[in-house]
């Protein structure tokens, strides 16, 4: 089975596929972010989920080099998006047209905006933590503008194992469908006959606070990460509709998370998909109220 819708509507069909014993090629990070507990609880065996996101596929492949106990850190790579190197003070007048111009990937508008704010990377940190059972503080984000190294695993002996290839989603999709086997001639490999440069830079959390916010929500609870995701979707749509400034995207999400924090801390896990939907709707409503108040 393949699950690829962009929002949490993919959760229920994914749960049904897992309960039926199907192998699931998962390209729907929102299901893990908002309802990972429900998703993983539907598995009838431990190896049912094949991650399709390029970063998680890379980690999944790299983890074959050691045991879980030997993993020191996961290193998630980010291209940096169209505003890599910008400071927060430079971002107030960014337009949707500018933010939709991603330097590496051609994606839908919401994912492209998420990539520009690095909220997409924050969601990927949440997904990696839950998929691979690694604590939030043991997941690092590094900016790698060439997008050749798709993510890495650092082991306790100091070795770092990565998966590298030219950016092409056919590769993780094919592996997600064929694993544990590999198909032949899926995509081009790296060209070792020409000089190339791979660079890695630290993430600027002041300019791009979305990853730190996602990490805070991950530490707090599954309900917090569901609110993060739902509020972000509303804020991104408002930005694309010219109803919210660029910096207002992550600021709005943080305000919603902070406002709902107290009511989310009772029971950290959702009892059902229906409860998740209720919390998501409330997060969207609050985000809309904040957005409308800024007009």
Q: What are these model-predicted stretches?
A:
Residues 1-295:
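Catalytic, metal-anchored helix/loop core of enzyme active sites in primary metabolism
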């Amino acid at each position: 089975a393949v699950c690829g819708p962009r929002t949490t509507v993919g959760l229920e069909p994914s749960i049904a596929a897992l309960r039926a014993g199907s192998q699931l090629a998962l390209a729907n990070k929102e299901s893990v972010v908002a309802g990972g507990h429900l998703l993983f609880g539907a598995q009838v065996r431990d190896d049912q989920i094949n991650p399709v996101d390029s970063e998680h596929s890379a980690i999944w492949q790299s983890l074959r080099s050691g045991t879980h106990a030997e993993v020191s850190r996961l290193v998630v790579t980010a291209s940096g998006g169209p505003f890599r190197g910008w400071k927060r003070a430079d971002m107030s007048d960014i337009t949707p047209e500018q933010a939709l111009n991603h330097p590496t990937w051609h994606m839908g508008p919401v994912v492209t905006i998420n990539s520009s704010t690095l909220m997409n990377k924050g969601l990927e940190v949440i997904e990696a933590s839950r998929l691979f059972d690694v604590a939030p503080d043991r997941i690092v984000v590094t900016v790698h503008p060439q997008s050749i190294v798709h993510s890495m695993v650092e082991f306790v002996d100091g070795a770092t194992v990565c998966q590298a290839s030219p950016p092409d989603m056919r590769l993780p999709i094919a592996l997600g469908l064929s694993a544990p086997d590999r198909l032949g001639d899926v995509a081009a490999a790296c060209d070792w006959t020409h000089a190339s440069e791979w660079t890695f830079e630290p993430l600027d959390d002041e300019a791009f606070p979305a990853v730190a916010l996602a990490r805070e929500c991950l530490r707090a609870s599954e309900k917090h990460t569901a609110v993060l995701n739902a509020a972000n979707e509303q804020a991104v749509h408002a930005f694309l509709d010219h109803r919210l400034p660029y910096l207002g995207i992550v600021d709005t999400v943080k305000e919603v998370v902070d406002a709902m924090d107290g009511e989310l801390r009772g029971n950290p896990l959702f009892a059902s998909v229906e409860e998740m939907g209720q919390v998501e709707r409330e997060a969207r409503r609050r985000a809309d109220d904040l957005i409308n108040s800024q007009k």
